[in-house]
């Protein structure tokens, strides 16, 4: 048996912009993607703490401290909203991996690792 478990989380990120006229996705700082072990193109769940929206999209590499929602997802958040970006991994039943959890400050810098 396999289970979907938390693999990575960017907690309390701030939306830096929205671009509705784009194919889709979320642009995330390349260094944050690397630190969180989230691949470019990986499916992620985004939880908007500010308004309660939840949705799935995929990642693209962004600029330093960027956290920008693109395409249809851009309608689900506004600049300044607090979000959580979550990725999951498929693990065998007895596997209990330690997830990578990064808490971010108001400027999308890592403030703490859990």
Curated annotation (Swiss-Prot):
<keyword id="KW-0704">Schiff base</keyword>
<dbReference type="GO" id="GO:0006523">
    <property type="term" value="P:alanine biosynthetic process"/>
</dbReference>
<dbReference type="GO" id="GO:0005829">
    <property type="term" value="C:cytosol"/>
</dbReference>
<feature type="active site" description="Schiff-base intermediate with substrate; via pyruvic acid">
    <location>
        <position position="25"/>
    </location>
</feature>
<keyword id="KW-0210">Decarboxylase</keyword>
<dbReference type="GO" id="GO:0004068">
    <property type="term" value="F:aspartate 1-decarboxylase activity"/>
</dbReference>
<feature type="binding site">
    <location>
        <begin position="71"/>
        <end position="73"/>
    </location>
    <ligand>
        <name>substrate</name>
    </ligand>
</feature>
<comment type="subunit">
    <text>Heterooctamer of four alpha and four beta subunits.</text>
</comment>
<dbReference type="InterPro" id="IPR003190">
    <property type="entry name" value="Asp_decarbox"/>
</dbReference>
<dbReference type="InterPro" id="IPR009010">
    <property type="entry name" value="Asp_de-COase-like_dom_sf"/>
</dbReference>
<feature type="active site" description="Proton donor">
    <location>
        <position position="58"/>
    </location>
</feature>
<feature type="modified residue" description="Pyruvic acid (Ser)">
    <location>
        <position position="25"/>
    </location>
</feature>
<dbReference type="Pfam" id="PF02261">
    <property type="entry name" value="Asp_decarbox"/>
</dbReference>
<keyword id="KW-0670">Pyruvate</keyword>
<comment type="function">
    <text>Catalyzes the pyruvoyl-dependent decarboxylation of aspartate to produce beta-alanine.</text>
</comment>
<keyword id="KW-0865">Zymogen</keyword>
<protein>
    <recommendedName>
        <fullName>Aspartate 1-decarboxylase</fullName>
        <ecNumber>4.1.1.11</ecNumber>
    </recommendedName>
</protein>
<keyword id="KW-0963">Cytoplasm</keyword>
<keyword id="KW-0068">Autocatalytic cleavage</keyword>
<comment type="similarity">
    <text>Belongs to the PanD family.</text>
</comment>
<feature type="binding site">
    <location>
        <position position="57"/>
    </location>
    <ligand>
        <name>substrate</name>
    </ligand>
</feature>
<dbReference type="GO" id="GO:0015940">
    <property type="term" value="P:pantothenate biosynthetic process"/>
</dbReference>
<keyword id="KW-0456">Lyase</keyword>
<comment type="pathway">
    <text>Cofactor biosynthesis; (R)-pantothenate biosynthesis; beta-alanine from L-aspartate: step 1/1.</text>
</comment>
<keyword id="KW-0566">Pantothenate biosynthesis</keyword>
């Amino acid at each position: 048996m396999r289970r979907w478990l938390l693999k990575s989380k960017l907690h309390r990120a701030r939306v830096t912009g929205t671009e509705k006229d784009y194919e889709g996705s979320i642009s995330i700082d390349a260094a944050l993607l690397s630190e969180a072990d989230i691949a470019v193109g990986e499916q992620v769940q985004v939880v908007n703490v500010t308004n309660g929206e939840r949705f799935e999209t995929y990642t693209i590499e962004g600029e330093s401290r960027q956290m920008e929602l693109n395409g249809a997802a851009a309608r689900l958040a506004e600049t300044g909203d607090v979000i959580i970006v979550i990725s999951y991994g498929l693990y065998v039943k007895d596997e209990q991996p330690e997830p990578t959890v990064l808490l971010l400050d108001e400027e999308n810098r890592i403030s703490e690792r859990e």
